[in-house]
Structure formats: C-alpha cells, structure tokens
Amino acid sequence: MGRTRENKATVIADLKELLSEAQLGMVIDYQGLSVAEITELRNRLRPSGAICKVTKNTLMEQAITGDEAWEPMTNFLKGSSAFVLVKDDVGSAVRAYQSFKKDTKKTEFRGGVMQGQALNEDQVKAIADLPSKEELIGQVAGAINSIATKLAVGVNEVPTSIGRGINDIPNSLGRVMAAMAAKEEGNG
C-alpha cells in the first residue's frame, strides 16, 4: 500500500524543515546497503549534526521546488537516493561520510548542494579539508592571546625603560663629574 496524500504532504513538510536548517546537502546512491549499514552511516553522521534521510526522489523534488538554495539538487535525483543533510559541522560530516564510503565501498556520491551551488565530489572533499569550527575558534583565540601578550610586554617595557634610564642618571652624573674633575686637574 502506498502513502496517502496527507502522509506525503507531511513527509514533504518535514523535508522542507530539514532543508531550511541544513548548510549542505549531499545525494548518495545507497543501493546495495543493508539496513544495518544505513544505520551505521546515520550513527557516524550524528555527532557532526548531520542526518541521513532515505526518501523517494519525487518527494524530495517537491520539497526543493521553488527553493533556489536547493534546486540544483534536482540534477542528482535518480535511482536509489539517500540524502545527507548537514546542519552543524560540515567538514566533520563530510569526513564521516568519506570514512563510511571507504569502509563499505558500496555508496556512490552523486553530488552536493551548498548555498545554491551544485558541488562535485572534489569540491565537497575540499570543504572537508577545511578546519572545523572549534579549530578555527582555537586559532582565532590563539591569535588574539598572542596579540594581547605582545601588547602587555610592550606596555610593560615603557616604564621599565624609564626606570632603567632614571637609575642610570646618578651613574652618568658621577661619570660626568669625574671627567670634569680630571679635565680640571689636567689644566691646572
């Protein structure tokens, strides 16, 4: 028995909601994967804020119709399609999928969509090579901390230099006085 019209409308609405929250969508061919393997893929994707949704191409097509951000996905809707929708850590999710693909050798990457642009596998791999959000935050924090440390050392150096200069005045004055006395003795 097929889905009812109301059931299809609910599925389409759910897909639209998932797409509205996603940064990246990948279409993969899941033919040949067992239920256990699809569950394994979902478990690998979950920590990165991604989900794997298996649905009919026609329902996904209805969900993306009219949405410029996702319309390029229509080029990849053929055969047995699973949709990896990434909300949070794009790089981590792509790496999780690549690891799964390498381990199972059963999925085929059809294409990806990000910000209205169709992406091939090499472009998606390039995204995976970018540092994660946490790594970028760490790099920025390290740079800010480095600047603050250098500024503190520089600010601290000014009074230290003034102090050294003030401490040298009596010594310099003593040397000047000794030189003047030696000069007077030499003249006298």
From Swiss-Prot:
GO terms for molecular function: large ribosomal subunit rRNA binding; structural constituent of ribosome. It comes from the Bacteria. GO terms for biological process: translation. Forms part of the ribosomal stalk, playing a central role in the interaction of the ribosome with GTP-bound translation factors. Gene3D superfamilies: 3.30.70.1730, 6.10.250.290. Pfam families: Ribosomal_L10. CDD domains: Ribosomal_L10. Keywords: Ribonucleoprotein, Ribosomal protein, RNA-binding, rRNA-binding. One of its GO terms (cellular component) is large ribosomal subunit. Part of the ribosomal stalk of the 50S ribosomal subunit. The N-terminus interacts with L11 and the large rRNA to form the base of the stalk. The C-terminus forms an elongated spine to which L12 dimers bind in a sequential fashion forming a multimeric L10(L12)X complex. Belongs to the universal ribosomal protein uL10 family. This is Large ribosomal subunit protein uL10. Transmembrane segments: none annotated.
